[in-house]
Amino acid sequence: MRRRLGAAALEMDAASDGSGHTRWRATVAARLPSQRWPERTVLIVAVDAHSGEPVVFDRHSGVDLVDAVAASCANGPPYGIGDNRYIDGGYRRSSENADLAAGYGRVLVLSPLGGRSRAPLEWGMHLAAQVDELRARGSRVETILPDSNSRDAFGSNLMDLSTRPPAARAGYNQGRALAEQLTEFWR
């Protein structure tokens, strides 16, 4: 599946004039609060459009944070870093990629899309399967899915910028409502 998606993205790339890359990078850079990698461990997932293999970027990858995020969110034509082309990291396994937290004692999974997946259940790519795997390996896992107010505010078009303020407010309110529960989780 990832290889087919990558091939389709590469076809779009071949038909484009290349200007989308510069615009996409500028868009991503403008939306990040900082263009420097955090000191804490942050893993950003993309999929190599040529091979279909997942790639995980971190501060030691030699890739700018803006480029890693742009590659991870590339939907349509792939995003180029050097000679490589990448597509959305959600195609790796799921938009959460929670399985990358294997080995940690406590894992907090934020699932803004509510754990939805288009993959068949038997593929084991759904969020529930990843959470089960983490727990089987000894992790304590808490998963936060959007509540109904957050889902309504977020809407169905992930790229609609008009939903950002109401979605942020709804997410903030949900976070405040969950604060005590999450405090207990981290104790």
Regions found by a protein language model. Give the residues of each.
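Patatin-like phospholipase
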Residues: 1-187
